[in-house]
Amino acid sequence: MKLKSFLLRYYPPGIMLEYEKHGELKTKSIDLLDLGPSTDVSALVEEIQKAEPLITASRTEQVKLLIQRLQEKLGQHSNHTFYLFKVLKAHILPLTNVALNKSGSCFITGSYDRTCKLWDTASGEELNTLEGHRNVVYAIAFNNPYGDKTATGSFDKTCKLWSVETGKCYHTFRGHTAEIVCLSFNPQSTLVATGSMDTTAKLWNIQNGEEVCTLRGHSAEIISLSFNTSGDRIITGSFDHTVVVWDADTGGKVNILIGHCAEISSALFNWDCSLILTGSMDKTCMLWDATNGKCVATLTGHDDEILDSCFDYTGKLIATASADGTARIFSAATRKCIAKLEGHEGEISKISFNPQGNRLLTGSSDKTARIWDAQTGQCLQVLEGHTDEIFSCTFNYKGNIVITGSKDNTCRIWR
C-alpha cells in the first residue's frame, strides 16, 4: 500500500487518504470528531500514526499542519454577525423550499408556481428557471458535495433531474401514484430517493433514469427520508408513526422503529451512522441504535408537536424545534437537555446547526429567524424583515451565509 495524497474535510473535521493497493486507487477517512481549538496536535498525530500504517514518520509534520488547518476552520465565522444582503422576489406564488449547494455559491427555490429557480448567492442574480412540472414543486435537493445536479419532486407525482449549469432536464422519474413530498441524493450521487403520499419510497438511477426499486411497507404517507453518510442505508419517516431502515443496495427492510404515538416529522442519521434521531407530533424525539433498531432514549420537555430536529455535524449535539415556540439542545451522549431556546412568538418549523457546531439557526411563523449560541442557548441575533411565516432557513457550508425562505414569496440572503 502506498499513500498518494491527503484531502481535507472541514466539517466534521477529517482527513481523507488516497492510496494505492494492488494498482488500484482507494480512499479511506480518518474522522476527527473530537477535534477542538485546544486539542494537542502532536499527541493526536501520534495516536493516528499508531492506528494508521499509511501515515509514516516522514508524513508527521505534514499531518500536523493539516490538523492545524482543520482547527483554524473550526474557529472561523464563530462570531459572525449577519446583515441583510439581498431580498429576492423569487416567485409569483408562495415558495415551498430552499436548498444550497455545498460551496454556497448557488441555491435553488421551489414554488407553488410549478417552477424552480437557481440563484447566484454572491450577486442574488437568477441563473436558471427550471420549468416542466405540472403542479407545485415541493421537494428540492442538490447532489452535494458535487453540486452539478439538482432534483425536484412535485405534486404532479414526478421527480425531475436537472443540470445546474444549463438548466436542462436529464430525466423525469415516473412511477409514484401521489404527490412527492421529500427526496434525497445518496452521498455517492448515483441514486435519488423519493418519498410520496402514496406510502412508498422509490430509488432511481441517476445515469439511466431507471427505477431501481420501490420501498414498500408503510401504511401511510412518507414525509421524511434520508441516507446515512456511507450511503448503504436509507430511512423513511411516515404518518403511520413508524420509521423504517432500508438497505439501499437491495431495497430490503433492515429495521422498523416503533415507539412514537403520532406522525413522524423528521428522521435522520448522525455522522458516524451509529444513531438515528426521529421527531414526532407526539411532542417527543427518540434516539435509536442504528444497528439493532432499539430505542436508546426519549427526549422530552416540549409542550407541543416536534416540527424539526437535527444533529450537529459531529453528532454530539441534538436540536429540536417545536410548535410550542421553543427549541431545545440535548447532549447525544447524556441525552440531557443542556439549553432551552426561548424568544420566538410562534411555532418553530426549521432548525439547523452551523457547520462549526457552535451556532443554531431557527425559522418561525413569527416571521423571524434567529441565531443562537449552541452552548448556552442565548439568542445572539434576530433576522427580521419577512412579512410572513419563515418555513425554510439554512447555513452554507462555511457558516457565513444564511438563506431564509418565507410565505411572503421572497427569499433573503444574509451575510
From Swiss-Prot:
It is found in: Cytoplasm, Cytoskeleton, Flagellum basal body; Cytoplasm, Cytoskeleton, Flagellum axoneme. InterPro entries: G-protein_beta_WD-40_rep (IPR020472), WD40/YVTN_repeat-like_dom_sf (IPR015943), WD40_repeat_CS (IPR019775), WD40_repeat_dom_sf (IPR036322), WD40_rpt (IPR001680). Disulfide bonds: none annotated. Its main location: cytoplasm. It holds the Pfam family WD40. Keywords: Cell projection, Cilium, Cytoplasm, Cytoskeleton, Flagellum, Repeat, WD repeat. WD repeats lie at residues 90-129, 132-174, 175-214, 217-256, 259-298, 301-340, 343-384, 386-415. GO terms for biological process: intraciliary transport; outer dynein arm assembly. One of its GO terms (cellular component) is cytoplasm. SMART domains: WD40. It comes from the Eukaryota. Interacts with IFT46. Belongs to the WD repeat WDR69 family. This is Dynein assembly factor with WD repeat domains 1. It comes from Macaca fascicularis (Crab-eating macaque). The gene is DAW1.
